[in-house]
Amino acid sequence: MKRSVKDSVFTYLFKQPEYTRQLYLALHPEDADVKESDFKLVTLENVLTTGFYNDLGIQVRNRLILLVEAQSTFSVNIALRMLLYLAGTYKEYIEEQKLDLYGSHPVEIPRPELYVVYTGDREEVPETLRLSDLYQGAGSAEVEVEVLRDDGTRDILDQYVRFCKIADEQREKYGLTQQAIDETIRICIAENVLAPFLASRQKEV
């Protein structure tokens, strides 16, 4: 089993329009009329010169930008990374829309929502990570990242977290082997965890 299998599944899963919509509805169940065509992937390929890549960026109807990271090892630094991802995403949006930042008229940009999906086994993690928690003293800029984890709802995010836990259990049992992958897929399909997705991409996971 590849160590990156959980990241690969996250990336491939939410690049598919039907699962992008399911992800959005897990976060915004009130917006039930949203269509697959309302979404645009804005995941960054590279941020600055540091080689940073973010897991998933979604633009919704030109009014909302969702940045979502998956993390199995908890890190309080995710708020700082999200600041870099958000700056890069806005830079691309401004260039694409040919917006004039030096003009006298207000520039309208999509509002951001920032999330980290925590799939590790640490019991106590904060519900929100803040950039200001990293400051040495007071500061004038803030970034807030909501921490999402297994909540028993069985929505697409909950299923992804469950998939990661099953994958970890099978890797611990069988090591980095094909058997670990096969068992992960078998158990997930039996439990209806990402079953259609895993069945369709079984040879690639």
Task: Please name every model-derived segment.
Residues 1-205:
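Elongated, amphipathic alpha-helical interaction scaffolds
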